[in-house]
Structures are given as structure tokens and as C-alpha cells.
């Protein structure tokens, strides 16, 4: 007896043949068609236990067919496949009630697994298709495999309120992912409130998040609502969560556990209804090991982990991204621009330490500062060239410029190796190079007093002594 009846609709004969062979070997009865009309006739007659359909067919788009299928047979699982591979082709099937979205080409083993899972699930699954209005803008751009995986995860999350933890380097677009999750999810009609934990003074974080009552502290002349209250019914995006102080982490954990909070200076618990999406450019597991982040809070936030890849891992998306940013610049009144083939190759060879944000800034700069319609490789070379180091300039690099100085050094360091990739062990080599002058400077400033140097550095005295020994740092004591 067949494991189930599968209806397959795709206008590509080769795709139909491959799916027929794979599904038949897995024990399913398969019916094939190359058009939407036949698929709709089968569905309306009550045939099939599951549907696999392409988006684009000769007579009708699957996006238009899906709502009719779900209205007639709400418990019929529908798997949508597409070669278009954009954010919207991933999100629209989910919005219209599809069980799963698969970008072409896909792994047949994965398809068989998804089919088995869909048929095994309880049939009381009820879809909640969105309205049929067109979306005004596409928040995420890219067709690379890395982005396809993000789209698929987002599509699965749209009709849930699960807490999401987004990780990724600075400039990768973590807030854009959070906004997409809100704007196309079930809370889209509620507010989206973003809080950058790194930008709030330490002593004001709890007031910022939970609000305060009049007289709660000096200067609190009126009651103020917090971000939880402002995000009620919507999404609260906690950016740079790794910078949250431990005491605020404790209060946040309590809110996640109990679903309520109290304002600073308040006594009455307030129920909260928000979806939490957190993000960090730091490895929270390392912060946990260092005693800087609560492990129990991490597990509460990390219900669905989502990593946004750096631009260098999705460099094939660069042409789409640069066109997108040029288009945005044109909408802001800047002249239209294009890149020639050599200029595009130059961009693909760049390491992009600032990720997508760096590319966006470059696109706007090109649109604003260069008169030619077509940007050439020479312009790109000039824009991406590291700044010239003048005599004595290294002596003037201050703390505010340390990140930029390290970035410039690393860019030069990487370019000195074949294919721009240095040998393994870079992390520890770079840390050692930075650690030695840092410890030496602290010891010099404290005249060799290791207790004062440890306090200055924020290290345990025994830790400092071990580092001095391991790094073979000479300690010179002086009087005074």
C-alpha cells in the first residue's frame, strides 16, 4: 500500500521525471501535471495527500493558487519550489499557507524527509494566509545559498512568536532580518521597537527597558514608559544583547520566565505581550565562560538561533546588492549609476570588513561624488585603497581610532598572503601581538606594580602574573 498520494505540478518535464522517480522509490503514489488547472481539478476533487508545486506555471502563479487550495482543503500540505530564490518567493508561500518552501536546485533526500514529516504531522494544522496585497519593498536582498537558508528559516517563523537570537558581524544586517521577521509575521500590525544595549548608559538600562515611576530616582520628575510597554503587541528587538549589564540580565530573565515586569520604582507587576528578538556581534558562549553573560538567559533567548553571514561568505550576492543600493540612492534624488564588469570584479575581490553596511556606504558615495554614469575599475581601486600612512601618523593614533587602525592593519596583513588568506592560528597570533604592548603599557604606567596594573587592566592578579610569565614580558620596577 502506498505511503501516500503526492500531486506534483511543474512545467519542466525533467523536474517532473526526477521527482516522480524519487517519490516512487520512497513508496509514494505520484501524479504529475505541467499546469495549474489540472492541479486545481485534482485538489478540488479531493485527490492527493500532499502537493508539490512550482511557483511559475504557464496558466497560473502558485501564489494565486495557494489561497484557493488552503480555503478548500486547509489541512492539505503544500510544498512550494522555485528557481527565483528571492526573499519574497520564500516568504509569500508561508504567508499564503504553504507547509514548506524549497529553492531550486534542492536535495532530493531533503525533499523526501520534508514530505514524510508533513504527512506524519497532525492534520489540524490551520493556515493563516495574509492578505493578497503586494509588498512595497524587499527588505532582504540576495540569492546565495547562505541567504536561501535564512529565507527558509524566516518563512517557518512568520506564523510563530518564538524568541529568535540573531548572530553576525557588525554591518551584516541583523536589524533588517529582525524587521523582516516583524513586518511579515503575525505581529506586523503591532509596533517594532529597537533598543541598542551598547548605546544606553549602564545606570539607565533598566529604566529604558521597563520604564520608571515619578520620583524613582533623581531627575525622574514624571512617569516614563519603557521599551517593553512601547512594544506591547509587537516586537522588541534587543540589539547588542552581549553589552547588557548582569543586573539588567537578571531582570530580563525574570520577564521572560514570568511574562511580567515592574517599572523602576513601581510595585505593581505589568503583564507583557511582546515577541523578543535579540542580536549580538559577540560570541555569547565566550561571554558566558568569562562570567559576563548569564547562561540561563542565553538559553531563554536562543530558542531559534539565526546566523547572518558576512558579505565575504555571500559574495555572489554583491551584484544584486549594489544594484539595490544604487536604486535606493536614485530614489533619494542621486543620479543613476552602473558598474562595468571590471569594477564589479574589484568589488568581489575586496574583503569587506564592514560587510553590507560598508558596501551600502560605498554605493551612496559613488552615486553622490562621481559624475560618470558607469563606474569603472579605477574609481573602485581609488575608493578601496587603504589610506596612505604619513610619517609619524602611527604615533597619533588614539584610542578612538584603535578599531580603525587594527582594521587597516588586518587588511594589509591579509593581502600579503596568497588568495588573501594567512595561515591557521591567526586569532591567537593577533591577540598576542596586541596583548604584549597592552600589558607592557599598563606595567609601565604603574611603575611595575603588578597589583595596580592588574586593577588597571581589570584582571585578577594571578592571571596577570601568568600572562607576564607566558608572554615573557620583562617587568622593571621604579621608585616613587
From Swiss-Prot:
Domain Response regulatory residue range list: 5-119
Binding site for ATP: 168-175, 231-240
UniProt cross-references to SUPFAM superfamilies, sorted A to Z: CheY-like, Homeodomain-like, P-loop containing nucleoside triphosphate hydrolases
Residue ranges flagged as DNA-binding region: 450-469
Keyword terms: Activator, ATP-binding, Cytoplasm, DNA-binding, Nitrogen fixation, Nucleotide-binding, Phosphoprotein, Repressor, Transcription, Transcription regulation, Two-component regulatory system
Residues in Sigma-54 factor interaction domain copies: 140-368
GO molecular function, one term: ATP hydrolysis activity
Domain of life: Bacteria
Entry comment on modification after translation: Phosphorylated and dephosphorylated by NtrB.
A Gene Ontology cellular-component term: cytoplasm
Residues that bear 4-aspartylphosphate: 54
Main location: cytoplasm
Compartments, record wording: Cytoplasm
Biological process per Gene Ontology, one example term: nitrogen fixation
Described function: Member of the two-component regulatory system NtrB/NtrC, which controls expression of the nitrogen-regulated (ntr) genes in response to nitrogen limitation. Phosphorylated NtrC binds directly to DNA and stimulates the formation of open promoter-sigma54-RNA polymerase complexes.
UniProt protein name: DNA-binding transcriptional regulator NtrC
Organism, scientific name: Bradyrhizobium sp. (strain RP501 Parasponia)
Taxonomic classification: Bacteria, Pseudomonadati, Pseudomonadota, Alphaproteobacteria, Hyphomicrobiales
Gene: ntrC
Amino acid at each position: 500500500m502506498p505511503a501516500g498520494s503526492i500531486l506534483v505540478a511543474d512545467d519542466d518535464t525533467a523536474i517532473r521525471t526526477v521527482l516522480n522517480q524519487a517519490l516512487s522509490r520512497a513508496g509514494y503514489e505520484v501524479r504529475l501535471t505541467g499546469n495549474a488547472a489540472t492541479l486545481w481539478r485534482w485538489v478540488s476533487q479531493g485527490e492527493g495527500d500532499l502537493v508539490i508545486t512550482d511557483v511559475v506555471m504557464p496558466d497560473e502563479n502558485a501564489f494565486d493558487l495557494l489561497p484557493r487550495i488552503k480555503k478548500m482543503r486547509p489541512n492539505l500540505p503544500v510544498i512550494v519550489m522555485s528557481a527565483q530564490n528571492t526573499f519574497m518567493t520564500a516568504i509569500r508561500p508561508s504567508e499564503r499557507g504553504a507547509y514548506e518552501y524549497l529553492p531550486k536546485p534542492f536535495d532530493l533526500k531533503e525533499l523526501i524527509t520534508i514530505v514524510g514529516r508533513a504527512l506524519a504531522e497532525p492534520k489540524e494544522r490551520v493556515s493563516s494566509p495574509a492578505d493578497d496585497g503586494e509588498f512595497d519593498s524587499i527588505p532582504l536582498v540576495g540569492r546565495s545559498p547562505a541567504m536561501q537558508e535564512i529565507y527558509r528559516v524566516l518563512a517557518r517563523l512568520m506564523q510563530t512568536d518564538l524568541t529568535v537570537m540573531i548572530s553576525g558581524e557588525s554591518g551584516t544586517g541583523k536589524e533588517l532580518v529582525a524587521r523582516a521577521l516583524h513586518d511579515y509575521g503575525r505581529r506586523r500590525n503591532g509596533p517594532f521597537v529597537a533598543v541598542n544595549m551598547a548605546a544606553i548608559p549602564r545606570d539607565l538600562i533598566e529604566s529604558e527597558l521597563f520604564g520608571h515611576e515619578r520620583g524613582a530616582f533623581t531627575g525622574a520628575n514624571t512617569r516614563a514608559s519603557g521599551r517593553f510597554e512601547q512594544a506591547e503587541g509587537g516586537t522588541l528587538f534587543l540589539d547588542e544583547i552581549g553589552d547588557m549589564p548582569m543586573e539588567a540580565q537578571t531582570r530580563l530573565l525574570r520577564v521572560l520566565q514570568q511574562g511580567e515586569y515592574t517599572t523602576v520604582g513601581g510595585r505593581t507587576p505589568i503583564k507583557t505581550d511582546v515577541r523578543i528578538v535579540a542580536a549580538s556581534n559577540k560570541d555569547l558562549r565566550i561571554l558566558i565562560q568569562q562570567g559576563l553573560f548569564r547562561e540561563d538567559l542565553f538559553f531563554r533567548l536562543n530558542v531559534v538561533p539565526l546566523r547572518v553571514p558576512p558579505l565575504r561568505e555571500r559574495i555572489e550576492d554583491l551584484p544584486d546588492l549594489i544594484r539595490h543600493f544604487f536604486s535606493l540612492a536614485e530614489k533619494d534624488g542621486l543620479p543613476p549609476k552602473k558598474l562595468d564588469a571590471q569594477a564589479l570584479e574589484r568589488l568581489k575581490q575586496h574583503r569587506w570588513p564592514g560587510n553590507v553596511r560598508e558596501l551600502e556606504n560605498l554605493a551612496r558615495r559613488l552615486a553622490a561624488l562621481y559624475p560618470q554614469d558607469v563606474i569603472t575599475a579605477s574609481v573602485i581601486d581609488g575608493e578601496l585603497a587603504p589610506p596612505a600612512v604619513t610619517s609619524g601618523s602611527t604615533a597619533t593614533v588614539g584610542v578612538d581610532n584603535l578599531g580603525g587602525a587594527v582594521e587597516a592593519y588586518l587588511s594589509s596583513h591579509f593581502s600579503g598572503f596568497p588568495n588573501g588568506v594567512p595561515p591557521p592560528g591567526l586569532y591567537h597570533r593577533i591577540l598576542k601581538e596586541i596583548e604584549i604592548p597592552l600589558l607592557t603599557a599598563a606595567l609601565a604606567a604603574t611603575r611595575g606594580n603588578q597589583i595596580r596594573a592588574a586593577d588597571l587592566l581589570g584582571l585578577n592578579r594571578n592571571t596577570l602574573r601568568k600572562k607576564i610569565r607566558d608572554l615573557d614580558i620583562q617587568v622593571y620596577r621604579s621608585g616613587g
